[in-house]
């Protein structure tokens, strides 16, 4: 006997079945790739895209949205783009570019996206942070009053750098800019300062050599190397500086001190210019886009010394009573010593001072080739170690007077005694400021050398034997006054007892004649 259903039962069954069906509504924002060339993709039909948003492309590749136009989006591909074709589907992700952060990155070499490229396996961190971030506000900042020792006599005495400062290293190619920055990184061993070295647009062989030198000097353990080599795309070279800054900020935000080197921002500006021109943005001076100043200012403003309140707020009370800092050493390469070019003037105006390295000094054998006349540190003076501040006052004056008199003495037939003495003192100060690469000097040894030249102990030492005398003097104090040297290095203090010990020790060493 057949079962009969009346219409109301049928409609009830259908209604129940419909109610049981769960349809998950999924909203997708998709567009179509209309052109691919030189690492730039144009996408039609994407709506609600953020500036700097990650756009998903086929084969697990991504692009960064930079141009938001009326009916299309101009984006730069991160990595290879050979597999992309016109008509490919592009999707928004709702995410800004993030990179891995954390202490696990120390001792590693990563690319601009934070992916390890040193063959040592995964990083072992799940923490990430956005590459672009607003710099700490004025309220959260503290004044710079703690030193960052570079280990260079000329820098620590005349152009001191403080924690949270931005100090530009500027000069022509092959004047020792990278060498100075690497020595500063090496000198942080044992100080607790974490370092980030960002290599932008350099040869892979050069970066490999730097990593090897850091390892040999025991500095790689406290350093992250971010490498965007010359063979990588302009997008990777542009992003790398911000990625490195994010990795350094991790330590600053948690009440620690970090040092970051950008080597160099000239190449980053060139990479950004390339991207901007390919995106058809209007060119300005030297064909750079109008926002090239903002490119560097938003990066360098993220270097700061932040207050205890900032650290406590950021860590939600887990870290209290500690200030954090990120010190930046940006490098700029000039062409034929022209510091009035567009990018050098921009970065000089953003930073808190500059160390100017000169080709003529470098070729004359004065290395580091620091031009003390136009090098300056605007905020580092208040962070300088007490003993160095006390002793180094006469160094800059001696050098300035020497340069002035040396130019004048070329035209004078005979010189009076006072002028001759000033010239000889200047010669000795210039010679004493020379220093070998990968040989950073401790505070006590710097103080010893400066004290000896200021007090006239080196006036009777031949100029060509000065560096040998200095080396012997340091060895003599290490053997006979080890406790004093350790005390000065630990406290950075200066008193009559230390001065008396310096006088006695230098006089003793001079009588040995073992130099």
From Swiss-Prot:
Site (described: Required for activity): 375
Pfam annotation, one family: ATP-synt_ab
Swiss-Prot/TrEMBL catalytic activity: ATP + H2O + 4 H(+)(in) = ADP + phosphate + 5 H(+)(out)
Domain of life of the source: Bacteria
Coarse class of the protein's main subcellular location: membrane
GO molecular function: ADP binding; ATP binding; proton-transporting ATP synthase activity, rotational mechanism
Annotated EC: 7.1.2.2
InterPro entries linked: ATP_synth_asu-like_sf, ATP_synth_asu_C, ATP_synth_asu_C_sf, ATP_synth_F1_a_nt-bd_dom, ATP_synth_F1_asu, ATPase_a/bsu_AS, ATPase_F1/V1/A1_a/bsu_N, ATPase_F1/V1/A1_a/bsu_N_sf
Keywords annotated in UniProt: ATP synthesis, ATP-binding, Cell inner membrane, Cell membrane, CF(1), Hydrogen ion transport, Ion transport, Membrane, Nucleotide-binding, Translocase, Transport
Signal peptide: none
GO cellular component: plasma membrane; proton-transporting ATP synthase complex
Topology of the protein relative to the lipid bilayer: Peripheral membrane protein
Residues binding ATP: 171-178
SUPFAM superfamilies on file: C-terminal domain of alpha and beta subunits of F1 ATP synthase, N-terminal domain of alpha and beta subunits of F1 ATP synthase, P-loop containing nucleoside triphosphate hydrolases
HAMAP family attached to this UniProt entry: ATP_synth_alpha_bact
Membership in a protein family: Belongs to the ATPase alpha/beta chains family.
Quaternary context: F-type ATPases have 2 components, CF(1) - the catalytic core - and CF(0) - the membrane proton channel. CF(1) has five subunits: alpha(3), beta(3), gamma(1), delta(1), epsilon(1). CF(0) has three main subunits: a(1), b(2) and c(9-12). The alpha and beta chains form an alternating ring which encloses part of the gamma chain. CF(1) is attached to CF(0) by a central stalk formed by the gamma and epsilon chains, while a peripheral stalk is formed by the delta and b chains.
Protein name stated in the entry: ATP synthase subunit alpha
Organism (species): Stenotrophomonas maltophilia (strain R551-3)
Gene designation: atpA
């Amino acid at each position: 006997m057949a079962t009969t259903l009346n219409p109301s039962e049928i409609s009830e069954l259908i209604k129940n079945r419909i109610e049981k069906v769960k349809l998950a509504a999924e909203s997708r924002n998709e567009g179509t790739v209309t052109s691919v060339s030189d690492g730039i993709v144009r996408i039609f039909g994407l709506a609600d895209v953020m500036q700097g948003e990650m756009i998903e492309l086929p084969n697990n590749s991504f692009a960064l949205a930079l141009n938001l136009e009326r009916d299309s989006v101009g984006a730069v591909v991160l990595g290879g783009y050979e597999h992309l074709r016109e008509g490919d589907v592009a999707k928004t992700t709702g995410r800004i570019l993030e990179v891995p952060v954390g202490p696990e990155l120390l001792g590693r070499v990563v690319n601009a996206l934070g992916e390890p490229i040193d063959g040592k396996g995964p990083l072992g961190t799940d923490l990430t942070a956005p590459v672009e971030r607003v710099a700490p506000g004025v309220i959260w900042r503290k004044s710079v009053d703690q030193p960052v020792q570079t280990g260079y006599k000329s820098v620590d005495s005349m152009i001191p750098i403080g924690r949270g400062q931005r100090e530009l290293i500027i000069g022509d190619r092959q004047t020792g800019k990278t060498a100075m920055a690497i020595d500063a990184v090496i000198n942080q061993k044992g100080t607790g300062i974490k370092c980030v070295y960002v290599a932008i647009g350099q040869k892979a062989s050069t970066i490999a050599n730097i990593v090897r030198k850091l390892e040999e000097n025991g500095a790689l353990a406290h350093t992250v190397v971010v490498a965007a080599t010359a063979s990588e795309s302009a997008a990777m070279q542009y992003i790398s500086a911000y990625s490195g800054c994010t990795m350094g900020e991790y330590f600053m935000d948690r009440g620690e001190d970090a040092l970051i080197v950008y080597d160099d921002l000239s190449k980053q500006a060139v990479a950004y210019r390339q991207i901007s021109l390919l995106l058809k943005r209007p060119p300005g001076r030297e064909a750079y886009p109008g926002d090239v100043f903002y490119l560097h200012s938003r990066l360098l403003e993220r270097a700061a010394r932040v207050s205890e309140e900032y650290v406590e707020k950021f860590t939600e009370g887990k870290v209290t009573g500690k200030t954090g800092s990120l010190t930046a050493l940006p490098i700029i390469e000039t062409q034929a010593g022209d510091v009035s070019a567009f990018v050098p003037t921009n970065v000089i105006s953003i930073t808190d001072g500059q160390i100017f390295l000169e080709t003529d000094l470098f070729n004359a054998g004065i290395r580091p080739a620091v031009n003390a006349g136009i090098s300056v540190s605007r905020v580092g003076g208040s962070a300088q170690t007490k003993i160095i501040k006390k002793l180094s006052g006469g160094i800059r004056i001696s050098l300035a007077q020497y340069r002035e008199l040396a130019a004048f003495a070329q035209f004078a037939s005979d010189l009076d005694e006072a002028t001759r003495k000033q010239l000889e003192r200047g010669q000795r100060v210039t010679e004493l400021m020379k220093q070998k690469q990968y040989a950073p000097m401790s505070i006590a040894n710097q103080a010893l050398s400066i004290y000896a030249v200021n007090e006239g102990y080196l006036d009777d030492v031949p100029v060509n034997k000065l560096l040998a005398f200095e080396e012997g003097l340091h060895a003599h104090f290490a053997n006979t006054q080890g406790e004093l040297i350790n005390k000065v290095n630990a406290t950075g203090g200066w008193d009559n007892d230390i001065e008396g010990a310096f006088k006695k020790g230098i006089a003793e060493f001079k009588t040995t004649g073992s130099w």
